[in-house]
Amino acid sequence: MELGAPTEESGNAGLVAIDRALEDYRAGGFDVLVTAPLNNNENFQFSGQSRYIEDHLCAEVPSISVLVNEKLRIALATRNLPLNQVSASLSVERITKSGKLLYNSIMRDFRISNPRLAILALNPKAGDNGLLGSEEQEIITPAIEALVGEGIQAFGPYPADKFFGDSYWEQFDGILAMYYEQGLTPFRALTVEGSVNYLAGLPLICTAPEITDNLEIAGKNIADPISMRHAIYLAIDTFRHRLEYDEPMRNPLQKLYKERRDDSEKVRFSIPKRRDNREGSND
């Protein structure tokens, strides 16, 4: 292998490393995984490390990629799709599922109770009442209503330009973008340093620095370690947050009351009444 030059051997070595890591995780060897950028090759039949890890770890468990820095958490409803395929890939079910994953992750992994979610529109001006597209009326708004119906604080759909241009994003704990460029462009524009890609929804805590492989600077001692450092810190924090969140759920206190089936009134468990000492006092 040549330093700074992508080769088939180097690409295969990266895959072997990920496969071994997943094997060790299944054997209980560790709790968190932090990955470095991987140079794709023809043997890499997945669109990105996140999909590869998800499909090889437990395909039935849903996950969502969340871009994280000190100010933003942006998730993507679709991942690595050509722009002309995004609209057909969106559905009420998909957006609802993505919103739930983001909401649950923010509560459990970031320890924010009752987070506020912003859902971005797909079309310019949020479709302009159907003149610029119907996805907002037919798909995105019903998905938001479904999330609200389940007790989730979801708002939108917001036009991306106004949402970020007028700093609406500062009022939310999480943002759901519809496609790659819609989420990545403002994220990178507003990120000074230390951006991380977090794969939420899996039992394995998995983070990665949001950077490319940058092979052209290999061996020059000029690579910035901040994103990798933040990826490691986020993995550690997430592990601790999950312990804190899960601990009270393991042995919950039993109810001191039960509900009667014939009405909604709560009835306390049968407790013998204290005998009135005054009864029979005249005898």
Where in this protein do the model-derived segments appear?
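Ligand-binding beta-strand-loop-alpha-helix segment within the catalytic cores
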Residues: L67-K97
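A glycine-rich helix N-cap at a beta->alpha junction
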Residues: S50-P62
